[in-house]
């Protein structure tokens, strides 16, 4: 699956983020807890250099908790502080400022020693489209400042947002890389809704989702579609699901487009429970 999606505002955002790094103390890198590596932009490492960072594992309520813990340990072993959060209901957000203060304590101690008046922490939020940046900012600021939605790429300009007296945030548009070298990365992003459905082959995404469920969560797959066994042939599996879900055309033929929609919707709306689509050891 070849996907190339790099709107002009993203190229501009990369340049502006690089400039804004001089103004900020710490970076909050927001990733999808279900796909922590695939939802990291490889370019971000080049952009951020050695800036202090906290990895925010967002949508943790949708991810397999045991796998999320593995990811947290993985990042901690790399010297990157990580927090599990849910930007929708606010879970874990009260840890962000204390963790930031801890990381920046030496810097602020040096500033105080030089007689510099204490100020709010200045942070930059960065991440790919649809990972929840705007929702996080609105939740932290307790008001609807940033535009939110399920359409990837909805935040198109940068803005500073005050969060109480202790934190100032710089929001940026989601920065997605020009193309995906690894097909699995594209499929993981697609199945979680990080890429516009209009530019991907949805049947490929549904097949990926089914194969993943078959390998990692087979009992959930069988339970959801009332299957005694999971057919090895993917076409037979599609037929079985289409028949169980009534995705039929005239003459009793399976409507594969409708079946594809059902499968992807079931995955994205957690009908299979909490899923993690990659592990640190994968």
UniProtKB/Swiss-Prot annotation:
GO terms for molecular function: GTP binding; GTPase activity; RNA binding. Transmembrane segments: none annotated. It is found in: Cytoplasm. GTP binds at residues 58-61, 86-87, 130-135, 174. Residues 14-178 form the CP-type G domain. Keywords: Cytoplasm, GTP-binding, Hydrolase, Nucleotide-binding, Ribosome biogenesis, RNA-binding. Disulfide bonds: none annotated. Belongs to the TRAFAC class YlqF/YawG GTPase family. MTG1 subfamily. This is Ribosome biogenesis GTPase A. It comes from Bacillus spizizenii (strain ATCC 23059 / NRRL B-14472 / W23).
